[in-house]
């Protein structure tokens, strides 16, 4: 018996104590050592006895017994014969489960190339032999010979010979040389490789070569050769002579009812290989003719290819049902593959799912669980209780009792469930709040009851949603569920730090109704002793809920010592607000409750409560608010009736006026005063404005009503119209929706996104006519199609983000860096988009913040800025703070807590072990489904942005112009001639108040440094056309303006004026293609006039569609328009918005026509032009001049002789993040990506903290390219993890060697995920085959640092509660290593076990051999 216990213990304790996994190529000997015997026959099982055939694919002698402890012939049965090998059938008596891990092998009659190393690009075999893939394939598939040993002939090694050439050579030289065909030839070449010699040659070549492409090629090959050298892999192992056979239980053969069998496709593929192999052996024994043998060898190669990766080469082999067979490669890749289906997405026991419904009477930490479900989920617990109480004698009896549902069982269930948390999950789980823990309350019925306040976190509604229930079993699991996942511990959103437990819909409406004021309501002016008395008056009908009254209120306020002190005052309020005050916790001020509470105000209230009083009080408050809200929503009786949609009286007048304006524009168009594009734009502007006016009239009408007050005078008050109240409170609906119900529907879009110029003037209350209805259907259908696309795209974005950031964990408290990023308030136009306090809240200060204008330290370095500090920042009006950021954090693998700052979901400095990468990915991905797919929101956003034509300042101050170049026209006004000018308004302290972009050709009334008053208009321009401004006075001379070739002349019939329109290059005849229409300015003598302070002639090239109204030879003054270019339809070009834009930014994609940035700082000049390009030269103060060719059609922002700084914009366009990183550095690129991503989310009203985006940027920047390697282990031009270079440089600094030089590189998230150090993580993401091939050849080691790798090998993740476990292991390992270092360093390699993965304990290394 003792033996048995020992044996079972030994069985369960497999050696999973490893810290590294290594992957490599398997040598033939290795494969034979795993194997338990050779598979010689293609047979599987005997059709009569169903026993496995001997030496077949399911042979019991090779793979182990079919029944536990029983040999095949039945001679030995039972446990006592354990380990005996039966002499009759040769089967070892042991457990059946060995059939899951015992492998076999096939001895191949001729070598076969492994398709992964051949066809997975770049071909590893091709790279190492330095032969093109086509040639290698010709050799492998027996079309050509390859010379393996040239001997004394004039053939070369690796040369290909056709059949004829081979025969000729044989006649000529006899057996002086050797040439082979098929995999043997390739194997021979690989075996003869002298890796060291090759490496040396490559290094020499690298020194000598100058061409960039050659360098790249050599570096690639050198890296591969070095990888082979270091990993101990041999190149000839890429060609197999032995094929491993998978254990039979991993490719099962299952009998179905009806005598048929279901089999794994692998068995078919193996059968093919064995059949062909056996046939080839026979042919070789018979010495068959060459051509037959060759054909058989080729077929063998093809069948092995199909087994390893079906469909990689040629047509995929199909089964009986015409569908391709699933090969070994297909088993592991893709969504259904081993990685994603079984290792990362396992099914869970003790779980159930059901429909959810509302539980308005629950507490926040509770959920209603149907009794039936609970009984099933908690079965084992009930059995054990029944048994331990002696109610049931055995487990079987207990089971019977539970099945009969005896009354005692329910009592025990209630006891078991008490304080045992359960997890609820709603798919899709887009962020961590999609799984939360609750205490179950047993209920009748079959639906799970959910607390209404957590619906926002789960994104749940009750229209048939289902949720899954999971039971945490172990004590640790229950503890984590209670301490970390309980719904009461997740009040704040991890994305923004705002409360996510906020009331919505009914509750908001109830509270809003309850806290509204009404003029002259019953009971107005009464006085009450306390809120209870006020409530009594309301309940007895003495006073209305909305009556303005005076109530004595007792507030509890904190004094200096931080104790709560009661203060009682008589305050003006309403009865409803006084009643609501009764649920307020001590320590909250009354002013928060004494207002009309909309959704935003309630959110603020809960936030305030959380910051002031902590978690417990806030949770109780949230619950109370919910109960009160529901009660008063029911009392309010708010409902929607058709008469609530009041149509404004002015509507018809507004529409008539708009129609008249449109008719006028149409007249102008007919008489040729405006172009078609301008007409279209103006029409759309007119209708957009009309729509706004109707909406405004309607909202004024709806939102206020006139009533008679107590004095008998009329007074305006907010309306009690139900529709208005719902929208105003934020319960449901919005102004935009009310506009469609009671205003006019407005402009609609065609399916391609362009705007139809006839708007829908009707609204839903009036009803649409057929045409209007038809136009509406476009939008509705597009909306549905978009939603479907959006969900998939958003999910994929989230997956890529999680993958790139998954291994980022807080690993230390402080990395000690002084670096950081500079934060200023975000100002766009006249509004502050985001105040400084909101941007720095929860960050750690990187440098002391000084009081403005003094040397006094206001906030010391390394302070975490909380709400109190924010008030200080506001009070002292600080406008720039340097904060620490994850992008500049110095921690090697991970981030430090100080650089990350506050844990947004908890409100304190983040803890070590927090998986910030995953949280960041979820926070960015989760709102993804709310972002539009459409290029932009139709009508609203597009036309409003395009209509601006002047700048009116909102604050007094001083004007500052940046990047401005201008001329002064004859009226003395300033006309801008620069393209990206910014106009800033600065107050007396030098703080930026407003910030505007001013277009080219704008007329400014104020110069740089001038004072402005509030409301002054400082700039104006024509929004529909862009002028070409003359910078000198003179006479116009046409150049290359040829009627009918480059321009067309248009004459206006009414006015007789003629204008010239330049044709697009694409539309011109061939003769006009190379002509460049331009206007030159000349003096009286006909000489070119130079642009002031340069030696460049004033000539202006005209782009296509430009319109010139001046004649040749006309006189012109400075600052006048020479021509105008119509701005095409309202900014529909290239506004990628919403989700695609975010994806583009994170993928770091290069835009189509990127901005051209200055590569160095210096003076601009123009060199010799070529046909289609001009030469731009930048000459620095010292050093080499830099030149580049720029296409002539690009508009330049710089003039001859101008000074530019490195990274300045030379030609407009979308900026490329790669350029920004190269020219302006890491901070600039971080700013760019963070601001651009935030721009998209802000437009949708989604709040995400900057630091989440910074976390992703850090991961995008984690690679560097080596620019100067010196004598380090790196190669020049190699891509390496930044942390590895930093570690190497620290070591070099200690040794006094020069530091390795490198440049940071920006990778898109997909690329960055695939370029991660961990091959397991990369393989489970995308392109599994390629990643594994690359890793195997290089003999990569996976240090198991990230989360994914650890989930895949089945361990606790190194984050959260698993963080400490991993740290302790590392500590132990270090202690052991130090102890070992004192002993003699003898290390013996144990023989590897017969498993796919061989593991080694001596230095805790695990090797995964990848052959099949």
From Swiss-Prot:
SS bond partners: none
Record-listed E.C. numbers: 2.7.7.6
Residues involved in Mg(2+) binding: 461, 463, 465
Reported cofactor(s): Mg(2+); Zn(2+)
GO CC list: DNA-directed RNA polymerase complex
Binding-site list for Zn(2+) 1: 71, 73, 86, 89
Enzyme class: transferase
Cofactor binding note: Binds 1 Mg(2+) ion per subunit.
Pfam families: RNA_pol_Rpb1_1, RNA_pol_Rpb1_2, RNA_pol_Rpb1_3, RNA_pol_Rpb1_4, RNA_pol_Rpb1_5
The keyword Cell wall biogenesis/degradation appears for this protein: no
Catalytic activity: RNA(n) + a ribonucleoside 5'-triphosphate = RNA(n+1) + diphosphate
GO MF assignments: DNA binding; DNA-directed RNA polymerase activity; magnesium ion binding; zinc ion binding
PANTHER family: DNA-DIRECTED RNA POLYMERASE, DNA-DIRECTED RNA POLYMERASE SUBUNIT BETA
Function: DNA-dependent RNA polymerase catalyzes the transcription of DNA into RNA using the four ribonucleoside triphosphates as substrates.
Subunit structure: The RNAP catalytic core consists of 2 alpha, 1 beta, 1 beta' and 1 omega subunit. When a sigma factor is associated with the core the holoenzyme is formed, which can initiate transcription.
Protein name: DNA-directed RNA polymerase subunit beta'
Protein source organism: Actinobacillus pleuropneumoniae serotype 5b (strain L20)
